[in-house]
Amino acid sequence: MHDIKAIRDNQQAFEAAWSAKGRSGAAAEAVKLDALLRAAQTALQEAQAKRNESSKLIGMAKAKKDEAEATRLMAEVEHLKAVMASAAQTETEVGGQLRDLLASLPNIPAPEVPAGEDEAGNVEIRRWGDASKLPAGRLNNPKDHVDLGAALGGMDFEAAARMSGARFVVLKGQIARLERALGQFMLDLQTVQHGYTEVSPPLLVKDEALFGTGQLPKFKADLFKTSEQNWVERLDEQIALRVPPLLNITQTDVVENLKGLRAAASMDEQAARWLIPTAEVSLTNIVREQITDEAELPLRMTALTPSFRSEAGASGRDTRGMIRQHQFYKVELVSITTPDQSDEEHERMVGCAEAVLKALELPFRTMLLCTGDMGFGAKKTYDLEVWLPSQNTYREISSCSNCGDFQARRMDARFKKVGEKGARYVHTLNGSGLAVGRTLVAVLENYQDETGRITVPAVLVPYMGGVTHIGGEA
């Protein structure tokens, strides 16, 4: 959420930044709505002041028995009430339009972010690793993870489709164990070596949480939502069946009374919940509507959770295999910092994500995303892309973003600086450390040999109970 005063004072800068993200004209529209809103507020205040003054004069006129003046003033008061009602309506309507507009506008890119329309404008920062030194590097035609998983009897897409539909998978045996080993290894690395605090957060969240991190309202179609009324309606049915005989009343009476009670009472606890698309939502919202002491920052948190995404915008893309799933595990990294700390923390976070790939000896490259390829809430983003032999290319496996105070404003998350009376907005950062499913894909493909046997990366052997190979002698 953006500060309208900042937009008003720096309209050209905001216009240029949003134009780079495909929202040309947004700053002018926001300033126009703001002017209408302030005009309505001024009109309302002026009408209120005049009404109050006229109301006093009515009493004075009546005291002087000046009925004509009293009548005139009363008519003026009625007119002012109409003016106030109109101004109040305009304030409500325009204020809502302005809030909706501001909620829909993306973050402002940092100055060093390259201009570009899509991934073609991204800039490679560095590469690490040599794919030719891994087992798959010696193969002319490496298999993809789907064929490898099926041959090993550990990956079943058909069974998953029968129970859940497309973009799901059933992992079994040593492949399932390898996925679990990867998640545990990543979590241990980020907590023990990198100092992140492990958190076990909710997987179901309210609208406000997703608004805070920027998924709502813009990306509603990408989310899974639970049904909000099913259990309430079933409870109503049972009450309607069981209560009437006890009270000697009709079921219709009970049902009608329940409708009235539910309409009058807060439905907050029965409202729908959303499945988290990433643990970023749960972890970042821990500081929602909180004021954190500066001494506690940076606050670093990590979690290994399932993530749920509808992939509404990915129709036809990556339909084969585990690259793009509705449900997948991911180790998330979140940092809450002061504005002075966030740039350095961003670089540190990228290093923490890279450390996983280095430990697994998986070749990767680090990309700085351009303006047109960055996410909604990010002001600067690095993507890590891992080498996949079957595709002969690099694919995204982590995205690390500095969101500045963009999410903090939406969540009202602030910190108290020593020696200052007021509180400032924190900066929030998030990144994958890493996506477990895609890392599993990379391990299977890069560590395959000509027989389809998989060598377990050395750092994972302790997590695999000493197993060194999958599909052959341990």
Swiss-Prot record:
SUPFAM superfamilies the UniProt entry points to: Class II aaRS and biotin synthetases, tRNA-binding arm
EC supergroup of this enzyme: ligase
Catalytic activity: tRNA(Ser) + L-serine + ATP = L-seryl-tRNA(Ser) + AMP + diphosphate + H(+); tRNA(Sec) + L-serine + ATP = L-seryl-tRNA(Sec) + AMP + diphosphate + H(+)
Binding site for L-serine: 278-280, 332, 432
Record keyword Secreted present: no
Cited Pfam families: Seryl_tRNA_N, tRNA-synt_2b
PROSITE patterns per UniProt: AA_TRNA_LIGASE_II
Key words, A-Z: Aminoacyl-tRNA synthetase, ATP-binding, Cytoplasm, Ligase, Nucleotide-binding, Protein biosynthesis
GO molecular function, one term: ATP binding
Highest taxon, organism lineage: Bacteria
Signal peptide: none
Pathway: Aminoacyl-tRNA biosynthesis; selenocysteinyl-tRNA(Sec) biosynthesis; L-seryl-tRNA(Sec) from L-serine and tRNA(Sec): step 1/1
Residue intervals passing through the bilayer: none
Oligomeric form and interacting partners: Homodimer. The tRNA molecule binds across the dimer.
Xref: PANTHER family: SERINE--TRNA LIGASE, SERYL-TRNA SYNTHETASE
Functional note: Catalyzes the attachment of serine to tRNA(Ser). Is also able to aminoacylate tRNA(Sec) with serine, to form the misacylated tRNA L-seryl-tRNA(Sec), which will be further converted into selenocysteinyl-tRNA(Sec).
Notes concerning its domains: Consists of two distinct domains, a catalytic core and a N-terminal extension that is involved in tRNA binding.
Sequence similarity: Belongs to the class-II aminoacyl-tRNA synthetase family. Type-1 seryl-tRNA synthetase subfamily.
Name of the protein in its database record: Serine--tRNA ligase
Lineage: Bacteria, Pseudomonadati, Pseudomonadota, Alphaproteobacteria, Caulobacterales
